[in-house]
Amino acid sequence: MELSLKRPICFFDIESTGVNVVKDRIVEISILKIYPNGNRESRTWLVNPEMPIPPETTAIHGISDEKVANEPTFKQLAHRIHDMIKDADLAG
């Protein structure tokens, strides 16, 4: 598949503490940025959700409370994520 881009496009994937959009939080976010010239940039961040990760959720994605205990919160990462996606179209 060939893309004809006028702006960069960022594809993103998240892992979370669950599927409830009101109470659950992100524990990992990955972004792949593709530029119109074909260059690529990618980043993955672990995120401290500031709440326990249920064992049944850890069994799905493998991310435990211990793994994110010393990671930044989403609020602490938000500016870096914004810097990566600010000039791009988004795709999930």
Can you annotate each of these PLM segments?
Residues 1-92:
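Conserved non-catalytic scaffold segment of RNase H-like nuclease domains
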